[in-house]
């Protein structure tokens, strides 16, 4: 056996530098983050040959005291923390005291700095971690660090560098991310003598987004914001036009620290999934402000990964915040005819005109849209109905509040029902007149100089999905007893997933018993599903749960199961009567998210008369 050797400081620092300094952009990131911690308002970064020949970072921050400059190059010397407990209350980017000694050990470095209280600054020069000179220097308040000949003494590292242009691109990317995180700081990036980025430092995030991504991006993003006692989430998400085949345009910041997080990415993408073009990823810039004690930033050498103390709470909060923002944005974009205050107006009309809800004749239901399993409760008021024009309670906003008096509802009960369903009664789409059906697949309708094309299968899928999902959340799912129970023998992994999610199956309408080792007996299934293939349905649910991972909340799992309820929807090429089409569109109008099916495909397309006139060359 070989003898154990104690490494010398030079060798140790070079090895440690391999973790902190992967490539030139790592140097830029560490130095710029130091400038941010110094409360600089202007930061200039200059690079040559992809950072291999030169990296220069200048700032107007607080500066370093003369007697601290040499200390700054000692391993684990830092002004950010005193003990391990301070890591859990960090408000700075750096804290380990590793950056400067690591960089100095593999390059030639010149640092000069002057705090406001001093009349002159100090300049220190080092090569390969060795002190060469330490002198006085005249300069403005702030710090300038010049790194040259990176990796000159570890030539093996040079072989792993990419081309100069690629390394420059990585540097540009990290400066852009830091600019987004700090819109109150003016950043300038100079690459090979040419200024390639220059932000305003106005404090306005939209200004930074415009400089980095352009005017078109700024015009296609929506703001979101939500707060709780321990966490705040805010930022911007792009519409489908900005979606791309990679995640390059996704930025996540936790307490202003740029990180990569599969948890946050999954939360945003799941929220966007119903509106997302298939196989493309949304643009987003998301900020999460959370008490430092709820995160651990000391889990990765480059500090680009963190751990959340309550990851499921964070996932759920981000998911709900982003999803609600997208939903509101789509309503506004798709249907400008629906006013933002329609909900309040509806309440006032109901309050001021109680006589509207008296002596209303029974509304007939001539069809079930081939989904008799849709057991719609009385209090949903409107779903799957066809109303004779004389039986409709009309108001001057949405003309779509219906009441069936068969049960002789008391006035108090009626008020309670109306109160509970005010949101459901607000139409998300305008009133439409049926034109016909194309190819027994698409419903054609018109409204106020707009042509609407509705995918009947996608629309009915969304209606079934929302109905089933709402019933799950309200514990109102009804089950149907199977004439002959189904016995499934599972492998040990699938059986374990079932046991771990037993409550999930119960709440979604399944009655399942353990029937021996790795074997289950399915006695009841959700009534809304009609007559599905039970074996495949159960395995689909198990596979979905497997794919989700531990970060997904129970609500997302409910949504995933609800998608499987859509198989009883009307299909393409099913011929529908005019009454069936009217009922389907009416249900879609009152859906919570009517624009996309559960799988992300659009349910409805709007073509304006202006677009048609352009197509026919009637106007230019």
Swiss-Prot record:
InterPro entries: DNA_mismatch_repair_CS (IPR014762), DNA_mismatch_repair_MutL (IPR020667), DNA_mismatch_S5_2-like (IPR013507), HATPase_C_sf (IPR036890), MutL/Mlh/PMS (IPR002099), MutL/Mlh/Pms-like (IPR038973), MutL_C (IPR014790), MutL_C_dimsub (IPR042120)
Keywords, comma-separated and alphabetical: DNA damage, DNA repair
DNA damage as UniProt keyword: yes
Alphabetical GO biological process terms: mismatch repair
SMART domains: DNA_mis_repair (SM01340), MutL_C (SM00853)
An example Gene Ontology molecular-function term: ATP binding
Pfam families linked: DNA_mis_repair, HATPase_c_3, MutL_C
GO CC terms: mismatch repair complex
Function: This protein is involved in the repair of mismatches in DNA. It is required for dam-dependent methyl-directed DNA mismatch repair. May act as a 'molecular matchmaker', a protein that promotes the formation of a stable complex between two or more DNA-binding proteins in an ATP-dependent manner without itself being part of a final effector complex.
Similarity comment: family membership: Belongs to the DNA mismatch repair MutL/HexB family.
NCBIfam families linked to this entry: mutl
Name under which the protein is recorded: DNA mismatch repair protein MutL
Species this chain originates from: Clostridium tetani (strain Massachusetts / E88)
């Amino acid at each position: 056996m070989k003898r154990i050797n104690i490494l010398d400081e030079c060798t140790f620092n070079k090895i440690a530098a391999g973790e902190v300094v992967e490539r030139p952009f790592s140097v830029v990131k560490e130095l710029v983050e130091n400038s941010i911690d110094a409360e600089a308002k202007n930061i200039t970064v200059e690079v040559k040959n992809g950072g291999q020949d030169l990296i220069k970072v200048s700032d107007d921050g607080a500066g370093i005291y003369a007697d601290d400059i040499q200390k700054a190059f000692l391993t684990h010397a830092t002004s950010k923390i005193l003990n391990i407990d301070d890591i859990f209350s960090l408000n700075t980017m750096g804290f380990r005291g590793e950056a400067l000694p690591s960089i100095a050990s593999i390059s030639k470095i010149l640092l000069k700095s002057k705090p406001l209280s001093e009349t002159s600054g100090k300049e220190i020069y080092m090569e390969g971690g060795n002190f060469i000179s330490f002198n006085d220097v005249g300069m403005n308040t702030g710090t300038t660090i010049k790194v040259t000949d990176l990796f000159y003494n570890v030539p093996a590292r040079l072989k792993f560098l990419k081309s100069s242009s690629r390394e420059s691109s990585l540097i540009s990317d990290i400066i852009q991310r830091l600019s987004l995180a700090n819109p109150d700081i003016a950043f300038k990036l100079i690459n090979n003598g040419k200024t390639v980025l220059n932000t305003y430092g106005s404090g306005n995030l939209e200004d930074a987004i415009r400089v980095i991504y352009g005017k078109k991006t700024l015009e296609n993003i929506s703001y979101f914001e939500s707060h709780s006692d321990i966490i705040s989430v805010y930022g911007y998400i792009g519409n489908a036009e900005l979606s791309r085949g990679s995640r390059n345009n996704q930025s996540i910041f936790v307490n202003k620290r740029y990180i990569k997080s599969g948890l946050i990415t999954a939360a945003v993408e799941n929220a966007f999934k119903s509106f997302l073009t298939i196989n493309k990823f949304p643009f987003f810039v998301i900020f999460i402000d959370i008490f430092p004690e709820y995160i651990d930033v000391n889990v990765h050498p480059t500090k680009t990964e963190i751990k959340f103390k309550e990851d499921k709470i964070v996932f759920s909060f981000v998911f709900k915040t982003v999803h609600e923002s997208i939903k509101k944005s789509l309503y506004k974009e798709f249907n400008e005819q629906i006013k933002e205050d329609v909900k309040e107006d509806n309440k006032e009309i109901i309050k001021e005109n109680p006589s509207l809800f008296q002596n209303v004749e029974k509304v007939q239901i001539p069809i079930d849209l081939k989904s008799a399993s849709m057991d719609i409760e009385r209090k949903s008021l409107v779903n799957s109905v066809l109303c004779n024009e004389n039986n409709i309670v009309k108001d001057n906003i949405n003309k779509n509040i219906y009441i069936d008096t068969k049960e002789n509802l008391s006035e108090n009960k009626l008020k309670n029902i109306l109160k509970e369903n005010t949101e459901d009664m607000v139409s998300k789409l305008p009133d439409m007149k049926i034109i016909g059906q194309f190819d027994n697949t698409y419903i054609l309708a018109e409204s106020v100089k707009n042509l609407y094309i509705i995918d009947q299968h996608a629309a009915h899928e969304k209606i079934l999905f929302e109905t089933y999902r709402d019933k799950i959340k309200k514990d109102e799912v009804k089950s149907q007893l199977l004439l002959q129970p189904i016995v499934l023998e599972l492998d040990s992994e699938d059986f374990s997933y079932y046991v771990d999610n037993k409550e999930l199956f119960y709440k979604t309408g399944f009655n399942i018993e353990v029937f021996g080792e790795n074997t289950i007996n399915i006695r009841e299934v959700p009534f809304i599903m009609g007559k599905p293939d039970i074996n495949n349905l159960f395995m689909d649910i198990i596979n979905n749960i497997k794919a989700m991972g531990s970060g997904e909340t129970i609500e997302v799992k409910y949504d995933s199961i609800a998608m499987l309820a859509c198989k009883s929807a009307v299909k393409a090429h099913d011929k529908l009567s005019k009454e069936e089409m009217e009922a389907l569109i009416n249900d879609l109008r009152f859906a919570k998210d009517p624009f996309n099916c559960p799988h992300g495909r659009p349910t409805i397309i709007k073509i304006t008369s202006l677009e048609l006139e352009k197509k026919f060359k009637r106007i230019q």
